């Protein structure tokens, strides 16, 4: 699996992810990029789950963004509808975290689109560790969104065997 974390604070939104790709108990790759910029660099997206499945979802989500002129929520809901109703897509095992300057969302294979509390999202095998540490940092420090995402991903990587210390961090300032 992997860990993806998104933090929003002080006119900045960040999505960060580790780079580990595992096949069973074997590390296949340590420097995968699971966080990307989409739609003219105005949308950030990260994935946890099957890599091939996630790339399929990235492509479909980007097509939805183009169709809806970059409207994040509408694109996410339309992708979730397709994901839930299409027999081929229903078999895909991945989750997406997406964000723009206005919203941060989780899109699941069950057709859920969730806007989180505290402008904080963490998914994947190390998601609970990243979430707990990021929430503590949000509530008790003045660190930037980028610093919180980086530190919480480091903590998750120290605890979760399916999360490593290679990080991809993308941010939008607004």
From Swiss-Prot:
Binding residues for Na(+): 157, 160, 163
Catalytic EC class: hydrolase
Activity regulation behaviour: Allosterically activated by HslU binding.
Keyword Ribonucleoprotein belongs to the record: no
Active site: 2
Alphabetized InterPro entries for the sequence: ATP-dep_Prtase_HsIV_su (IPR022281), Ntn_hydrolases_N (IPR029055), Proteasome_sua/b (IPR001353), Proteasome_suB-type (IPR023333)
EC number(s) reported in the record: 3.4.25.2
Gene3D superfamilies found in the cross-reference section: Glutamine Phosphoribosylpyrophosphate, subunit 1, domain 1
GO biological process, one term: proteolysis involved in protein catabolic process
Catalytic reactions of this protein: ATP-dependent cleavage of peptide bonds with broad specificity
Localization of this protein: Cytoplasm
UniProt GO molecular function: metal ion binding; threonine-type endopeptidase activity
Function: Protease subunit of a proteasome-like degradation complex believed to be a general protein degrading machinery.
HAMAP family: HslV
Stated name of the protein: ATP-dependent protease subunit HslV
Organism: Shewanella frigidimarina (strain NCIMB 400)
Gene: hslV
């Amino acid at each position: 699996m992997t860990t993806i974390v998104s933090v929003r604070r002080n006119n900045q939104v960040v999505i960060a992810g580790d780079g580990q790709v595992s096949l069973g108990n074997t590390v296949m790759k340590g420097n995968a990029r699971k966080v990307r910029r989409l739609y003219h660099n105005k949308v950030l997206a990260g994935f946890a789950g099957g890599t091939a499945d996630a790339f399929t979802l990235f492509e479909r989500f980007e097509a939805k963004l183009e169709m809806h002129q970059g409207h994040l929520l509408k694109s996410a809901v339309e992708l979730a509808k397709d994901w839930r109703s299409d027999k081929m897509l229903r078999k895909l095992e991945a989750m997406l975290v997406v964000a723009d300057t206005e919203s941060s969302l989780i899109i699941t294979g069950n057709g859920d689109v969730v806007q989180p509390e505290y402008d904080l999202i963490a998914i994947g095998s190390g998601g609970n560790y990243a979430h707990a540490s990021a929430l503590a940092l949000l509530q008790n420090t003045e660190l930037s969104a980028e610093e919180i995402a980086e530190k919480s991903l480091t903590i998750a990587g120290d605890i979760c065997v399916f999360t490593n210390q290679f990080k991809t961090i993308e941010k939008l300032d607004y």
